[in-house]
């Protein structure tokens, strides 16, 4: 772990970690705190009887400083767990009884609802085989030609938090975009240009600079490469165009282009059905909602909106089914949605109301 000025949350973070993962040793690098973060860390682990060490390293960039922490830890345990101060385990995380793989991916989500689920490397062998790359949105690279990898599934998420010290900076996303854009145009890390373009777009989006985000998502899509990033870039262009009140025809073409690029993903069709319904194109909405519902949960790992596959596409289909006169389908879907544990409670009154409306026609 690397930390800076996390005194407000670090104890809760550490409590959360040890409640889910047994720790034998800790290594944490402080990158320039001017509060008592390091003291809180030491006091916490002393109370728990867990040995370890805290280092103080000058800040350079994320990959550099994570590598510093990794070098401090090398050889002191069999595996290392990587964790950010504002991340949290939610649910029932079960560590495999026997650790045999070189690298482990854990389920990440941006909220407890499970929307935008993806997998990230959070644990790997502590034998010098792995290192970090990237000035921002850094990732784990391997030195060995082949490694054994494993995804840890289960009823849990690691929630990627936004309440640490860095997130309190109102200019965070704009500044991140500037750093990533500079890295994109730098002659270094030529093989990371597609990644830098993608996260430049993400950062401009999160800074609410939608036109710039669209420009960079388009740049990322045109670079080709990893199909999941290309698909997500195409989808985001369409969704940002919706935010900018682009004409329906333009939005429809963009969402269909995303679907055509990756037809095993349902998100683009769900959003298309919703936009068509909102523009009173009910018959078309019904067709595309039907198509979205027919797509099973994807095996993709990047920013998958599980809620679309679990209930949102069915919700959209139920509404359009009612308006095209397929009252039985609307009725059946509403019953299913009412008993679907993935549906947030605040939506169920609407499903019950829709169910009653459909019943009147049966």
Language-model-detected regions and their locations in the chain:
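A conserved acidic beta->alpha catalytic loop
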Residues: 16, 29-41, 58-59, 84-85
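Acidic helix N-cap motif at the loop->helix transition within catalytic regions
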Residues: 11, 35-44, 92
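Short, well-formed alpha-helical segments that are part of the catalytic scaffolds
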Residues: 5-21, 25
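Conserved donor nucleotide-binding strand/loop of the catalytic core
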Residues: 39-72
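Catalytic-site signature of metal-activated, phosphate-bearing donor transferases
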Residues: 63-70, 87-215, 225
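"A position-specific structural signal for the A-helix of alpha-solenoid helical repeats
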Residues: 199, 236, 271-274, 278, ...
């Amino acid at each position: 772990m690397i930390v800076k000025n996390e005194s407000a949350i670090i104890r809760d973070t550490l409590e959360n970690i040890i409640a889910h993962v047994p720790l034998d040793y800790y290594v944490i690098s402080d990158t320039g705190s001017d509060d008592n973060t390091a003291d809180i860390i030491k006091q916490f682990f002393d109370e728990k009887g867990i040995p370890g060490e805290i280092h103080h390293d000058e800040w350079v960039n994320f990959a550099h400083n994570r590598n510093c922490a990794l070098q401090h830890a090398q050889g002191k345990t069999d595996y290392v767990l990587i964790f950010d101060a504002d991340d949290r385990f939610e649910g029932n995380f079960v560590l495999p009884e026997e650790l045999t793989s070189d690298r482990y991916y854990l389920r990440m989500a941006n909220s407890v609802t499970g929307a935008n689920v993806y997998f990230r490397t959070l644990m790997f062998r502590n034998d010098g085989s792995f290192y970090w790359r990237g000035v921002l949105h850094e990732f784990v690279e391997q030195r060995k030609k082949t490694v054994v990898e494993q995804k840890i599934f289960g009823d849990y998420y690691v929630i990627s938090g936004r309440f640490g010290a860095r997130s309190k900076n109102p200019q965070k996303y704009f500044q991140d975009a500037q750093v990533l854009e500079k890295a994109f145009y730098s002659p270094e890390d030529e093989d990371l240009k597609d990644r830098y373009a993608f996260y430049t777009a993400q950062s401009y989006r999160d800074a609410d600079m939608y036109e710039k985000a669209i420009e960079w998502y388009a740049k990322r899509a045109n670079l080709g490469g990893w199909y999941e990033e290309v698909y997500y870039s195409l989808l985001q262009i369409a969704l940002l165009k919706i935010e900018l009140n682009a004409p329906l025809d333009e939005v429809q073409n963009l969402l269909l282009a995303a679907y055509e690029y990756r037809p095993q993903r349902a998100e683009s069709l769900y959003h298309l059905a919703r936009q068509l319904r909102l523009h009173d194109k009910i018959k078309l909405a019904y067709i595309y909602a039907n198509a979205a519902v027919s797509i099973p949960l994807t095996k993709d790992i990047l920013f998958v909106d599980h809620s679309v596959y679990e209930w949102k596409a069915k919700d959209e289909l139920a509404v359009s089914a009612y308006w095209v006169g397929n009252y039985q389908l609307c009725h059946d879907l509403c019953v299913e949605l009412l008993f679907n544990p993935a549906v947030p409670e605040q939506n169920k009154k609407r499903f019950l109301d829709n169910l009653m409306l459909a019943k009147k026609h049966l």
